[in-house]
């Protein structure tokens, strides 16, 4: 077994900052650019109208689109927003990853252990020799030093290591892609090309937090011990995170199950109004919320609803309703980040992953007898407008809804549902299968669906 810390692993030019990404994105939309230079914009749809010559305004819009996509992707994949001051400087998570043999503490985290925690490796950031050694089994994945090499290569999806001139890790920050990207497993399980927007249902955020040597920053704001913090986050399990913990301090539900919720996808959001399971706000609101309050970046965030000592006592103590950092490392990035996210389409299922005839029958049921389309309105598969419902309307308890400002649950968009079956369905995974979801609604709305009709609905949902 070999480690690769002796030779570089980063592909030359793979990531040279926004200018490289801008060039790459420009290539991907070359058809648009070519059309602009020829004086015409290619018609996006068959409108039946003649396409007029492109104006200066048309060119400006198209060129800005290319720029926004490139900058947004760079932000989504690689920007820490200064969060290393929390994850590294405060929690000292980088020390636990490195281990005592590499200037840190404890045994360290090997690549195999990191993969078991649900972290992913971007194979596009690795030179061919490293990929070959991964596939042949000659790369040492049981050495924390190899983990550090992967961090130096910017190959760990959603995690950024900071190193001094002696190649010693000094801090660590996180990126949007940590929770909202995965990989295609093209090289090995957990190692492959990025799939932006896919919720990482393998990621055990709580277990990662729990290994940090110093949780006093969280313990102090929650007014509990560090051991209590570890007990709470270790209960989350893979694919879950509790964004409200540092707002209301509720680590567990009344039934003693974790209060954490499933990590949602960040694709298919174009045309969708409210975001998150309980509709905290639009995508733009949630990006600002998460980057400031959950990632612990340095920016500006204002939401007076959090200034409520009864509902959000922890948020009030921490002043989270009005955050203003100088310098602001987040706000200048939000517009392009939003643009990129809205461009991520929900992925279509592969042929053979659902039964087409059954799906066609299920589509008729979805729009007709089952009444699903009343709330999950095609083609958005959520309601245009204020897509929120009370717990009683959908037949579940109010615990998670009560942790949000509006006390309701969002109608989740359904496209790409096949990508995030792991961990169950609904906000907390209470329904283990799509069939269980349909059984719930069949009883709640007295639909009288037959067993065959339920099966057809499942196939239709898998086809979206």
Task: Go through the PLM ranges and name each one.
Residues 2-11, 19-21, 28-464:
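Periplasmic c-type cytochrome electron-transfer domains
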